[in-house]
């Protein structure tokens, strides 16, 4: 069985402001320290990978905090989903393996994603060609330079300059004490 997690990386708000908003919404979550002007939120309810919950929370947070957010979901280390939110709306979404849940379908290349919007939202327009390449890489091809979807997410996180703990970590990872060793020294703020 592969890795499952979800999280939101927000650009703009302070950790304190996000924590206050989460408390007012009565959410149970962990929040990372700031890194390059971004913070990562690990919401307990979103960990169930219910897209309606993820989309609702993403809209609400970015509208309330007037910011951009990237919600990411890793499903069994086989599929990476993400949504880019800005100011209460979904700008675009992404699915790395759209045929994954169709047993009668051949594998298909990733759908969605918009490297220009993604780089603009996180203030790194010069990395757009690399982000475009990461999003469109077919991991089943012989030319694939990354082996699985966790590594695709980690590559996006690195190139976009997001907190490193945005890839490979979710609410359950933190709560259960299963953090990758490189993140053991991070102090996450608990909410709820």
Regions found by a protein language model. Give the residues of each.
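Acidic/proline-rich low-complexity IDRs
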Residues: 17, 21-24, 64, 178, ...
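Long, compositionally biased intrinsically disordered terminal regions
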Residues: 99-192
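Short, extreme N-terminal segment that most often corresponds to the first beta-strand
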Residues: 1-35
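Charged/polar, solvent-exposed surface patches and flexible loops
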Residues: 20-24, 56-59, 63, 120, ...
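Glycine-centered flexibility motif
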Residues: 2, 12, 86-88, 161
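Short, intrinsically disordered low-complexity segments
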Residues: 26-100
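Alpha-helix initiation/capping motif
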Residues: 2, 14, 43-45, 96-97, ...
């Amino acid at each position: 069985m592969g890795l499952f997690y979800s999280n939101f990386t927000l650009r703009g708000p302070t950790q304190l402001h996000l924590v206050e908003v989460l408390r007012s919404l009565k959410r149970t979550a962990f929040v990372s320290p700031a890194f390059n002007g971004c913070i990562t939120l690990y919401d307990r309810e979103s960990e169930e990978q219910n897209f309606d919950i993820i989309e609702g929370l993403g809209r609400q947070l970015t509208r309330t905090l007037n910011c951009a957010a990237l919600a990411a979901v890793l499903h069994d280390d086989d599929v990476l989903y993400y949504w880019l939110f800005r100011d209460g709306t979904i700008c675009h979404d992404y699915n790395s393996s759209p045929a994954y849940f169709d047993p009668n379908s051949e594998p298909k290349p990733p759908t969605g994603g918009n490297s220009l919007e993604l780089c603009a939202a996180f203030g790194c327009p010069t990395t757009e060609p690399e982000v475009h390449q990461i999003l469109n890489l077919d991991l089943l091809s012989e030319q694939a330079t990354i082996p699985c979807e966790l590594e695709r997410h980690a590559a996006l996180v690195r190139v976009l300059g997001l907190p490193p703990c945005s890839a490979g970590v979710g609410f359950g990872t933190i709560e259960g004490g299963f953090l990758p060793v490189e993140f053991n020294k991070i102090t996450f703020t608990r909410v709820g």
